[in-house]
Swiss-Prot record:
Its biological purpose: Part of the Sec protein translocase complex. Interacts with the SecYEG preprotein conducting channel. Has a central role in coupling the hydrolysis of ATP to the transfer of proteins into and across the cell membrane, serving both as a receptor for the preprotein-SecB complex and as an ATP-driven molecular motor driving the stepwise translocation of polypeptide chains across the membrane.
Gene Ontology molecular function: any one: metal ion binding
Family affiliation: Belongs to the SecA family.
InterPro entries, per database record: Helicase_ATP-bd (IPR014001), Helicase_C-like (IPR001650), P-loop_NTPase (IPR027417), SEC_C_motif (IPR004027), SecA (IPR000185), SecA_CS (IPR020937), SecA_DEAD (IPR011115), SecA_motor_DEAD (IPR014018)
Cofactor(s) needed: Zn(2+)
Organism encoding this protein: Shewanella piezotolerans (strain WP3 / JCM 13877)
Tree of life domain: Bacteria
Lineage: Bacteria, Pseudomonadati, Pseudomonadota, Gammaproteobacteria, Alteromonadales
Subcellular location: Cell inner membrane; Cytoplasm
Annotated catalysed reactions: ATP + H2O + cellular proteinSide 1 = ADP + phosphate + cellular proteinSide 2
Name assigned to this protein: Protein translocase subunit SecA
Amino acid sequence: MFGKLLTKVFGSRNDRTLKAFGKVVNKINGFEEEYGQLSDEELKAKTKVFRERLEAGETLDDVLPEAFATVREASKRVFEMRHFDVQLIGGMILDSNRIAEMRTGEGKTLTATLPAYLNGLTGKGVHVITVNDYLAGRDAENNRPLFEFLGLSVGINVAGLGQVEKKAAYDADITYGTNNEFGFDYLRDNMAFSPAERVQRPLHYALIDEVDSILIDEARTPLIISGAAEDSSELYTKINTLIPNLIQQEKEDTEEEIGEGDYSIDEKAKQVHMTERGQEKVEVLLTERGMLAEGDSLYSAANISLLHHVNAALRAHTLFEKDVDYIVQDNEVIIVDEHTGRTMPGRRWSEGLHQAVEAKEGVHIQNENQTLASITFQNFFRQYEKLAGMTGTADTEAFEFQHIYGLDTVVVPTNRPMVRQDNPDLVYLTAEEKYAAIVKDIVGCRERGQPVLVGTVSIEQSELLHSLLKKEKIPHEILNAKFHEREADIVAQAGRTGAVTVATNMAGRGTDIVLGGNWNMEIEALANPTDEQRAKIKADWQIRHDEVVDAGGLHILGTERHESRRIDNQLRGRSGRQGDAGSSRFYLSMEDSLMRIFASDRVSSMMKKLGMEEGEAIEHPWVSRAIENAQRKVEARNFDIRKQLLEFDDVANDQRQVVYAQRNELMDAESIKDTITNIQTDVINELMDQYIPPQSVEELWDVAGLEQRLQQEYTMVLPIQEWLDKEDDLHEETLRERIVDTWINAYKAKEEMVGEQVLRQFEKAVMLQTLDGLWKEHLSAMDHLRQGIHLRGYAQKNPKQEYKRESFELFQQMLESLKHDVISILSKVQVQAQSDVEEMEERRRQEDAKIRRDYQHAAAEAIVGAEESAALAATQPQVREGEKVGRNDPCPCGSGKKYKQCHGKLS
């Protein structure tokens, strides 16, 4: 109550922000008349003046009013479009590390030109980030004339560009591209072997379009560069044949009654679990096929990999649906983005799930992958010095933007009042009744000439509706992941009189639906349109536009509520752009997944109380509230998943920053001779401490062990025992100095023989390749650790603290291994000439060429509640073949340490 009263008196935080920016808008408007009288050359010269002022010590805020006024005037001349005052406010929000919520049709693309130009003046680079290559290319080409008029260069960063083209794109003042490409380039730069191979400059300013899609929907998906691991396609095919023999259990087991099924599904958590009966049945089937020894258990340590394959196949068959979660195209399984309905070529599910789905669909099974480098979008974007974003729907996620990224959300008022009519939801008992009502609504709209956009949550739904409309002989266009080639054309004409367009989630489509159809596209379709043709097209469009407005504008029809209110708002936001007429309504049924999983009991009881009969719809605020509460529950759960993923990735991120910084230092250094000398001294001291403990008596020295280790690992044949026998005054400290001197002198002799330049180059190559190899193994170990860490909760330990502690131990072990491996290689390898180093480099390049880029999709579920798969992944490294190694035996890795002090630490 008091909060509302204070807001009434002082205004909300949003109002106060808008008021402050409103004062700057008045300053910008004050320059309009003066700048309107400048010649083109005088206006272009402003860029040089602003840059000189910035170099002289002025800030971007100092030049902002004049810079924005310059862009507005240039836009009037180049595009014949003038920035509205609300767009100027949007530009200021984006320049001040905030998120601007701007409704559809309010000109986000034009708004972005203001902060992009202002920050482009610094010469440090501006990255304008969109969700797909089409939008990146379109926005770059559309805005290029404006930026080039003002003397700024524009680059496009999309998939498939070569290194030279990428470097040129990044060197431009303003670079348009997709989040995937910027992220991949960051990882690739940190796998480069020379400064010349890097393409990115330091990350300065990122301006993200559809920011909620990239920073929230994509946040559960780590970005991964991977290389192919071993081929196990035959095993996936064999395991796939078992699953159709299993039966789903309808009810959960209770103390009184044990169910009949082989597996149970938890739809909420998207998990499937084998029952005891199912486990026994699978063991029998595996034994019959000769894949499991008679009497052996699927859960024994030696069969963990087999259990992992069975679980992956079970998930593929029970949780992942064709034309909902993925499509099959050109003998490949392609994931469909649940948020946008777009296909995501090149993106693959992790933990063998993608291979299991490929086996289920009978397509070519690709090899499993090994992670070479990875980062989450959250940690990638947090590295930018300045970060801002814009979207039509950010307010529902404002808390997450602030909590994770430190970005405030400001809602920008519309240029014209919103007049769209949002009707309450209609809820039916069955899906059949719901679809009958939807078709009836579409028929009504067509009769009065009102265009309809029908939003579905899956390809399967859009095709069901397609068949129903065909049956009723209603002409319509369908837009989903299978028919996306004509996307821009279909969306552009979706506002024509009586048009019916069925589309999967419309998020991020990027093309405005103009009432009466898009006349610009009609003109562009003509080769050389005359003025008469242009005038006729525009006049015809005006008639159609008025007809559509009289019919009620664009009608949005949702066939189901999405898990996120934001996606529903994005669909609604397609109508009512720039004060246009419009309406919207969602049709639901008790069989919809959201209702069935999260809201069924409460809503069903309400329906009974309200005396609902078959074929009737319910329209009541109680029901709408219950549905909204169900959506809030899902949003909260998804936020927790993203937050947990970030907390775990923050640990890896600290290590990633250390490794990448070290790598870049190595690469930029002309010589790492001093580093190698320091490592050599460290390695010798560690060996000495191990075999000749400090301040110990000679009887405790293991001289023979030290001589053997030096010879085996470092090809150093030193007569240490002979020295000790001959020289009485040789004690531990002087012996240590002699070994160091002998070692360094031997290395100097190698340098004289090979040549200093060749050896320096070789040292750098060895150091980088060894670091990359160990980092790759470390990432794999971290994955296994993370997937099983939740089990520590059963031992009354905090999984996050345990993960931090153990990952730090793994990291220390990696750094120790790096020192020993580098010195071992440099000691053993005989470099004859420059050609040897070049050959090594060439081999490395060939291996790099084989690396394929992949996404690991929905990996976060392994952290949150994936009991079985996480347990399997955690125990996988412990599978052993052959004899058991005793804790006090020498470690099989050849380090010379006891097993318990080396790789036994990980057991």
